[in-house]
């Protein structure tokens, strides 16, 4: 849109434009928090017998999912999460299995699980993948990313995880 058109809109809607500009980040945060609350509700309804699900609205890691039933003690060192690489902008969300910071474990001591969508590994992530490069708020509003679809993606990854036997390197 041309600058002249923006000026015209600004003049006609000064109060609304000013409020939007002043509250832009807070409104984005609220949209994202509501989205993840809905994702949590869906996941809890479907997975409550196997997983504990926590929300964290102030951090770059808005949702944390821990397996509560796995008999494999090695998996207790990791949890599933969504983590924003640009936390202040809620951009570049990664999903994957992150090491628990409270546990004395090295990711490099384990083989990377063969889980679709989680192709990478770092010193913090046992396995992770990037969902999209963009701002999640834009994906929610413009691309109509729904909590149901996002929860479905997470459930699909967790189903693969349940079948995987974590292998510790010698």
Residue ranges and their predicted role:
Residues 1:
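Contiguous mid-protein beta-loop-alpha structural module that forms a pocket-lining wall or clamp
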Residues 17, 142-170:
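Long, solvent-exposed, polar/charged low-complexity segments
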Residues 11-136:
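Polyanion-binding interface signature
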């Amino acid at each position: 849109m041309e600058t002249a058109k923006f000026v015209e809109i600004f003049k006609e809607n000064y109060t609304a434009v000013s409020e939007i500009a002043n509250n832009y980040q807070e409104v984005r945060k609220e949209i994202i928090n509501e989205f993840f609350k809905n994702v949590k509700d869906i996941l809890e309804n479907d997975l409550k017998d196997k997983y504990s699900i926590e929300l964290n609205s102030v951090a770059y890691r808005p949702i944390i999912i821990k397996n509560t039933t796995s008999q494999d003690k090695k998996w207790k060192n990791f949890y599933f999460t969504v983590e924003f690489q640009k936390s202040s902008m809620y951009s570049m969300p990664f999903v994957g299995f992150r090491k628990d910071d409270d546990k004395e474990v090295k990711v490099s001591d384990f083989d990377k699980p063969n889980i679709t969508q989680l192709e990478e590994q770092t010193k913090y992530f046992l396995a992770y993948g990037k969902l999209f490069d963009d701002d999640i708020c834009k994906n929610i509003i413009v691309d109509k990313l729904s909590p149901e679809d996002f929860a479905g993606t997470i459930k699909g990854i967790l189903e693969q995880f349940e079948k995987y036997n974590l292998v510790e390197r010698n």
